[in-house]
Amino acid sequence: MGKNKQPRGQQRQGGPPAADAAGPDDMEPKKGTGAPKECGEEEPRTCCGCRFPLLLALLQLALGIAVTVVGFLMASISSSLLVRDTPFWAGIIVCLVAYLGLFMLCVSYQVDERTCIQFSMKLLYFLLSALGLTVCVLAVAFAAHHYSQLTQFTCETTLDSCQCKLPSSEPLSRTFVYRDVTDCTSVTGTFKLFLLIQMILNLVCGLVCLLACFVMWKHRYQVFYVGVRICSLTASEGPQQKI
């Protein structure tokens, strides 16, 4: 009767802490770094602060503009150059693909398609990226063929044109004429350098288009199902109330 009783909620000597010390706010799950995220809160993968598919679209746009500019510079050297030898058309197609990708990724992109419009835009971007890959491969092939010919040409200036021939023992060998050229060095030097630049740019651009196709395929057939599985696991591993 004379001994003082310990206050309620105070830890006894040698025993576990009393459960009464925890207030009602402590029973709620705390949100921190270890707290499970909700199903709709999947963080997008980033690269240098930018989402990875968005970075691919930006690369497509930059490379497409570069290919287009170099192609028009090549066309200005001679008026007799074929369209296949000045692949500005490949850059224009890749720029259109990039514009569609930027619109899709910045406005209405979702990893799991929730509407028919999102699915249609992703499918169209996938098909156009495949088309961009095809035209880039063609541009590389045409540029490489013309570059290999320029390395074997013997050129001479005639009036306002440059006439080039392949070394051959036949007297009637084929002659390539580059009109509106005052100096053959613009063909054997400048144009040859532009062909090499086009091969490099179109090769990189084709790889970026291939990677864009892979990312679209992966988001369609892999990330969607993995996201559903993670959501089910996080829902089952939620905090359980102790009895």
From Swiss-Prot:
Keywords tagged on the record: Cell membrane, Membrane, Postsynaptic cell membrane, Synapse, Transmembrane, Transmembrane helix
Tissue specificity: Isoform 1 is expressed exclusively in heart and skeletal muscle. Isoform 2 is expressed in heart, skeletal muscle, thymus, prostate, testis, ovary, small intestine, colon and spleen.
Keyword Protein transport among record annotations: no
Cytoplasmic topological domain: 1-53, 108-122, 215-243
Disulfide bridge partners, by residue number: none
A GO BP entry: muscle contraction
Compartment list: Cell membrane; Cell membrane, Sarcolemma; Postsynaptic cell membrane
Pfam family, one: CD20
Principal location listed in the UniProt entry: membrane
Region annotation Disordered: where it falls in the sequence: 1-43
Residues in the Extracellular compartment per record: 75-86, 144-193
Biased composition regions of type Low complexity, renumbered to the chain: 7-24
Membrane-spanning segments: 54-74, 87-107, 123-143, 194-214
GO annotations of cellular component type: dystrophin-associated glycoprotein complex; Golgi membrane; plasma membrane; postsynaptic membrane; sarcolemma; transport vesicle
Membrane topology: Multi-pass membrane protein
Stated role: Component of the dystrophin-glycoprotein complex (DGC), a complex that spans the muscle plasma membrane and forms a link between the F-actin cytoskeleton and the extracellular matrix. Preferentially associates with the sarcoglycan subcomplex of the DGC.
Protein name: Sarcospan
Species this protein is from: Homo sapiens (Human)
Lineage: Eukaryota, Metazoa, Chordata, Craniata, Vertebrata
